[in-house]
Amino acid sequence: MTTDTDTDVDAGTDLEPQPEGPPEKMLTRRTELTPMLSQYLDCCEAHPDALVLFQVGDFYEAFCEAATTVAQVCEVTLTQREDSTGTYRMAGVPIDNATSYIEALLSADFRVAIAEQVEEAEATSGLVDRAVTNIITPGTVTNGDLLTDAAATYLGAVSITDSDGDASEMTGAIATVDVSTGACRVTSVEHDQIYEELSRLRPAELLIGPEVDTKTIESSSLPFETMQTTHNSGAFELATATQTLEAYVDEPTAFLSSAERRAVGAVLDYAEYTQGDCGPLEYVSRIRRYKTDTALRVDATAIQSLELFDSRQPYGETLIETIDETSSALGRRTLESWLRRPLADHEAIKTRYDAVAALAENPLVVETLTEKLSHIYDLERLTARTAREQADARDMRSLLQSLDSIPEIKSALIEVLTETELPAETLEQLQAELDSLDDIRTLIDTAVCSDPPQTVTDGDVIAKGFNDDLDDIREREEAGREWVSELETRERERTGIDSLEVGYTEVHGYYIEVTNPNLDHVPDEYTRRQTLKNAERFYTPALKRREDEIIAASNRADKLEYELFCDIRAEVAAETSRLQAVADAIGRLDALVSFATIAISHAYVRPEITADTLAIEAGRHPVVEQTQAEFVPNGITFEKGHIAMITGPNMSGKSTYMRQIAHICILAQAGSFVPADAAQIPVLDRIFTRIGASDDISGGESTFMREMSEMTDILHNATESSLILLDEVGRGTSTTDGRAIARATVEFIHNEIGARTLFTTHYHDLTTVTGSLPSAFNLHFKVHRKTHPDNDASVTFLHRVTSGAADSSYGVEVAKLAGVPTPVVEQAQRYIHTEGEDYTEISEQGTHHHDELTHAEMVSVDHDNQQNQASDDDEIARSPRGADTNTDAGINQSDVSANIDVLKSLRDIDIARMTPLEALNMLENLQRRLDE
């Protein structure tokens, strides 16, 4: 919004410092400011950590430094406001379209305080009162337009108990609240688990207790985006936090530790602050305390490398996207929470399997449930908006539509329970929890119009017949409008003016319009109201009385409708706990139906939970099998403490195979069926991964220090109940050092930890450790190598796991398949021949150690191969051949054996993990060293 004294100015390119807080220029002229700017300054001082958007008419305005920020971030015009006290920069955004601008400010890491006009301009002759009604931050978003998807948005808080300075002995607590739904949770964690738990929860905003060293929780080091907030330190004080909690739960000291009380108290205090200091958030009706050791723990590294929720590729699929067949936002959030915290209790897992199995037995009912669940709106967020007094009439109708689906959902569940012979404790419980909420349904259905306007103050919100007084007022209003509509006919007949018209404008009200040629026929009782170019507008005493009656009735009706709607909304809000219970049940049912749907459509099988054995028969990668036309299943069988040494070329599928096993274990413990012909899964306590980029050369590669840091975490924290996936440990350093580190790692895991481990390596002599480690065995990926008449060779990856160690890494052949120029490939082959046969050979002990596999292991691997039995020629016919090579590049071939260091450097190169540019740079470096 601009005034006659506003002028455009250049916003510049750099953000000015401190756009939040009171502008220095206004502080120095406080006594001279206009009343409106004084209001703005007061809002800025009250919220120094936020950028204030100040309502002026139909715009939100910002001034001084904040104006520059708004202009640059939101790409709007920066102007100047001049008054008697000076010149102030200003920038504004239209209120009707403010959401996109607020989203841009949030993305730029600003908190936004909304200062609204809290009284109508017509209601006062002086300055309109304004107040900050909402502070929007990344972790406290409640606006439906800013909540872009069904995912939970968490505000988190971290507190740590007092200690004697020994960080290893410190314990802390992490609390989260989803302000949009009211879900609040807290857990205690060891000091070294804080990072891991935060990575699992992924709060959008994080409050740090004053006793926490922020260096230990730097947002830049977390594997997700979060805003780190320093809130009022007093909110973390135990007494203050306990007092805050007492408004939510009875006797918080009875079930929450001091660290937990401090974390929950602080997070709720901040949530209240951002909602306009409205007091306790009534819809936060329950605080759930959980333990981290009651779930399968998947740390941040594993979450990333397994691509559970985020893909490393720009358009890659994730595990949750692949298995998500939910129909509602409630189900999607539940499904994600189950994947983030898979079960670690045998009976709980089995109970969830029973529910999925009972549903999967009846595909038609599953289809019915899917269709009915699709009519369920986001009940949690609707309930929260209702409790915050932000729900409008359309929200009420959405709530009604959701509740109307519940009886049919209950009927479908009863059909499943009637027909199944399986234990169905979970489904029985859900059926009982699905309260039809008939009282709320009846209230909304009889009270709120079926197609109400967006704004509840616009009228036509309350249904006819709900309130007698409102109906009487509406009848008087309607009678007045009918009288006016009949007036035109009567006056035409009475005056003889056929062109006479009766109309209405917001400014002048009702009028009788007569064209200029007929003005001589205007009756004396007509009073002129407005003169137009070709006509005059009049009113009569009777018309004016009717107009006053209609306006008065309309205003009374609108006021009464708003009062009635607020009463209805409050009555619904009083049932928040019942609505939340139904929402929770719907979410769990939707997630179970999703599991059943994926099991039916993709032939997933029910796993068997075992004590020790991990056996997968013809397992499939759940993501890859849906993105590739042909997928070769592979299985594995190994007991607690067994280590599978996996060899084979790059691109053969080793990393995919390891991720496949991890995905199957995670799905199994989440309660889902799994992609395999059969599966026996033990209850794991943790999954660790040290996996580099995915099986193409477009992925990034971790530094050696990162690799060793991750290995340190694994070796310190893994137990015999863990699953460890290690991909080419030691590749980031010299061959000698890398081989030594890899071997020592395998021996330590075997002798000291005893965890089930999958270990891929290109150090072929490392496969000989199976001779000295009784629980280690070799697996490799089969490759078909064909020599052509011109002595050229090609390889085809069969993607099939079999026992024993690979006879070569086929690095040069992989480079050729990847399209590396022919001169580079040929020269690499010469270097290999120069080094001798020992470059590719491995010891007989490593090659033939598969004789030492247990019978079960050999049966598992061989059975999977038989399941996919086809001749190598058939496999080759279906597999892509290498790309045509580029023969334009030249290369210096002189003195190839003159410098043994150059040859060793070439041998250590992992070509398949190099980009074309890196390969050419390395080749240039080798040439230069030879020339020297």
Swiss-Prot record:
Per the record, which residues fall in region Disordered? 1-26, 865-892
Q: Name one GO biological process term.
A: mismatch repair
Q: Does the keyword DNA repair apply?
A: yes
Q: Which Gene3D superfamilies match?
A: 1.10.1420.10, DNA repair protein MutS, domain I (3.40.1170.10), MutS, connector domain (3.30.420.110), P-loop containing nucleotide triphosphate hydrolases (3.40.50.300)
Where are the coiled-coil regions? none
Regions of biased composition (Acidic residues) lie at 1-13
From what superkingdom does this record's organism come?
Archaea
The keyword DNA repair is annotated on this UniProt entry: yes
Task: Extract the GO molecular function terms from the UniProt entry.
Answer: ATP binding; ATP-dependent DNA damage sensor activity; damaged DNA binding; mismatched DNA binding
Provide the residue positions that the database annotates as binding ATP.
648-655
Assigned keywords, A-Z: ATP-binding, DNA damage, DNA repair, DNA-binding, Nucleotide-binding
PROSITE patterns recorded: DNA_MISMATCH_REPAIR_2
UniProt similarity note: Belongs to the DNA mismatch repair MutS family.
- Function noted in UniProt: This protein is involved in the repair of mismatches in DNA. It is possible that it carries out the mismatch recognition step. This protein has a weak ATPase activity.
Its protein name is DNA mismatch repair protein MutS
- Please give the organism: Haloquadratum walsbyi (strain DSM 16790 / HBSQ001)
Primary gene name: mutS
